[in-house]
Swiss-Prot record:
Pathway: One-carbon metabolism; tetrahydrofolate interconversion; Amino-acid biosynthesis; glycine biosynthesis; glycine from L-serine: step 1/1
Lineage: Bacteria, Pseudomonadati, Pseudomonadota, Alphaproteobacteria, Hyphomicrobiales
Organism: Rhodopseudomonas palustris (strain HaA2)
List of residues binding (6S)-5,6,7,8-tetrahydrofolate: 132, 136-138
Enzyme Commission number(s) of this protein: 2.1.2.1
Assembly notes: Homodimer.
Site (Plays an important role in substrate specificity): 240
GO molecular-function terms, A-Z: glycine hydroxymethyltransferase activity; pyridoxal phosphate binding
Protein name: Serine hydroxymethyltransferase
Family the entry assigns: Belongs to the SHMT family.
Subcellular location: Cytoplasm
Gene Ontology BP term (one): glycine biosynthetic process from serine
Cofactor annotation: pyridoxal 5'-phosphate
Annotated catalysed reactions: (6R)-5,10-methylene-5,6,7,8-tetrahydrofolate + glycine + H2O = (6S)-5,6,7,8-tetrahydrofolate + L-serine
Amino acid sequence: MSTSAKHTSAPDSFFSASLEQADPEIAAAIKGELGRQRHEVELIASENIVSRAVLEAQGSVMTNKYAEGYPGARYYGGCEFVDVAENLAIERAKKLFGAGFANVQPNSGSQMNQAVFLALLQPGDTFMGLDLAAGGHLTHGATVNMSGKWFKPVHYTVRREDGIIDMDAVAKLAEETRPKLIIAGGSAYSRAWDFKRFREIADSVGAYFMVDMAHFAGLVAGGAHASPVPHAHVCTTTTHKSLRGPRGGLILTNDEALAKKFNSAIFPGLQGGPLMHVIAAKAVAFKEALQPDFKVYAKNVVENAKALAETLRAAGFDLVSGGTDNHLMLVDLRPKGLKGNVSEKALVRAAITCNKNGIPFDPEKPFVTSGLRLGTPAATTRGFGVAEFQQVGNLIAEVLNAIAQSPDGAAPLVEASVKQRVKELTDRFPIYQ
C-alpha cells in the first residue's frame, strides 16, 4: 500500500514557514513597530520594554495548551509542564512581593480588578476609589465602566491647591458612605500612598482595603516604593508597566480564605482557560525582578523621574502636585496656553512618545485635556540615566515652547531638529540587537 498520498490538511510550510513568509503584511507591521521602539523615546508611563527571554516565553508552544483550573486540579490532561510554569510563576510572585497567596491567571488589569469585585461585593454595593479625573482608573468606578454600572462608587479626590490626596477627607467620606471596599491606587497619581492610614480608615468602617498597584508594582518589587502588601486585604497589579513583564494581571493576598474567593472569581467566575504562554512569560519576568539588578533598575526609575520633573520645572512648566515620588508625572499645560492632544502630537512628530492626560479639575474633554503624562520605566530599561532624562526634559520643553508660539500647534523645524537629536540619543542605547 502506498504511503505517498498526503493525508494532512496542513500545508508543507505550516511548521516551517517564517512569519515573513506566511504573512508579510503582519511581518511588516511588526518590523515597523520595532523600528518605532528603537528610534523613539518612550515616555508613556504604562509601557515598558521586556527582555528577549520574556518575548521567547510568550511566543512559545505553551500557546497551544488549554489548562482550565489550577495546577494539580485541571479539567484537561497533558498539563504536567504548564503546571510547572504556573507553579513557578506563583512561587516567584509570592517571594517577590512577600505575599502568602498569588493568582497569576488574570488576563489583564481590568479582569483582575473585576475578580476582586466579584469575590467581595454584590451588585449595588458601595465602594470607594480615587476619581478618574484626579488620577484614578476606569475600573475604580468610572461611569462608563462595569465597576461604575454594576456597583455604587463614591470617589475621593485631591486637594485643588496642591494636587495631593486629603486623607482626612477620605476618612470623612468613608464614615459618611460606609463602603464595603476602599481602593488605593490609580493611573496618574505621582505621590506616595499612605497605606497604613487607608487600612485604618477601612477598618473603622468595616471595609475591605484593596491596593491597585499596577503602575508602581515594579518599584515595590525593587524596594523603591513602600509595599502595600502588609496593609491591604488584597493587592492587584498588572505584570507589565514598571514590573517589566508580559501584559497580564496578578492578585496577591495574605488571607487564605480570600485567596480561595479570588481563585474562584477568576476561574470559573470570569475566565476559562488561562493563557499559559503568558503565565510562562510572567514567571520569567518575576525571576528577573528577583535579581539584584532589578533593585538598581527600580531606584533608577524613580531618580530619573525626579530628574525629568526638575528639568521641566526649571524650564518653566507646572507639574501637578509639584513633582513626583514614583515613576510618573503630570504636566499642567494651561500656563503655556497648550492642550494635551496638540502637545502629544507635536512630541510624537519629534520622536518623543507620551500621552495626553486629564489633570485634576480639568475643564477640557478627555480627548483634548490640559495635561501630559510622562513616565520613566521604558527609557530607564534601555539604559537612560539622569543625564539623558535631563536632555529629554529640555527637548520636550523646546518642542512645547515652540508650538506654544505657533498658531497651528506645529513647529516643523524645531520638531525635525529634536527628532534628529532623539535618534542620536536612542542610537546610543540600542534594543533587541
